[in-house]
Amino acid sequence: MKNFFLTVFWILIPLLFFAQNADIDLLREINLNRNKALDPFLRGITHTAGPVAFVVPLLLLVVASIKKNRKLKRKAVIMVISVLTAVIVTTTLKYTINRPRPFETYSFIEKVTSGGSPSFPSGHTTDAFVLATALSLAFPRRHIIWPAFLWATAIAYSRMSLGVHYPADVLVGILIGTGAALLWHIIFSSRQESRA
C-alpha cells in the first residue's frame, strides 16, 4: 500500500506542476493580450454575479408567495437551495485549498479589479453558472437559456481577463455551479415522480 501511494505521489507531482504551468500560460495569454477597451464592461459585469445569483431566486420566491403559485415557488426553492449549496462548496474549497490569487504570485499579471478571498475556485463564476443552469432547468426556453449562459460565460471570462483567477479556478467554478443546480433539479424531480 505504501508503494502505491508513493507511485501516485510521484506521478501526481509532475502532473500538478504541468497543470500549474498550463494554467498560468493560458492566463497570461488572456490577461496580457486582452482588449483593454473592454475592461470597464468586464469590471461592471463581473460584479453582477453575486447580487444577481441571490436576488433572482429570492425575487421569484416572493412573487410565487404573493401569487400563491406553488409551481413557481417550487422552482424558486430549487434555485435558492442550488445557490446556497454552490456557495457553501465554493467557500469551503477556497479556505481549505487557500490558493493565492494569480496577481499575488505572478507580478506580470495585471490586476484590473478586486479579488479578496483565496483564488480556487472562482466564486463569481460559480454564482453565475449555478443561476444560469438553475434558471435554464426551471424555464427551459431559448430566450432564458441563451442570455443566462452568455451572462455567465462573460463573467467567467472576465475573472481571467481582469487578472483575478486562473483558468482552473474558473473551470471548477463552472463545474460546481452547474453541478449544484443539476443535483437539486434531479433530487426534486425524482421526489415529484415518486409522489405521482
Predicted regions and their residues:
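N-terminal transmembrane-helix/juxtamembrane module of multi-pass inner/ER membrane proteins
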Residues: 2-57, 90-117
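Structural signal for the C-terminal ends of transmembrane alpha-helices
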Residues: 18, 61-71, 137-140, 183-189
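Alpha-helical membrane-inserting segments
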Residues: 85, 89, 93, 97, ...
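Alpha-helical transmembrane spans of integral membrane proteins, capturing the lipid-embedded, hydrophobic core
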Residues: 8-11, 79, 83-87, 174, ...
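Transmembrane helix-loop junctions in multipass membrane proteins, especially transporters and channels
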Residues: 66-69, 95-103, 164-168, 189-194
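Membrane-embedded catalytic cores of phosphoryl/pyrophosphoryl-handling enzymes
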Residues: 108-196
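Interfacial segments of alpha-helical transmembrane regions
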Residues: 60-89
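Alpha-helical transmembrane segments of integral membrane proteins
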Residues: 5-6, 73-82, 144-147, 168-172
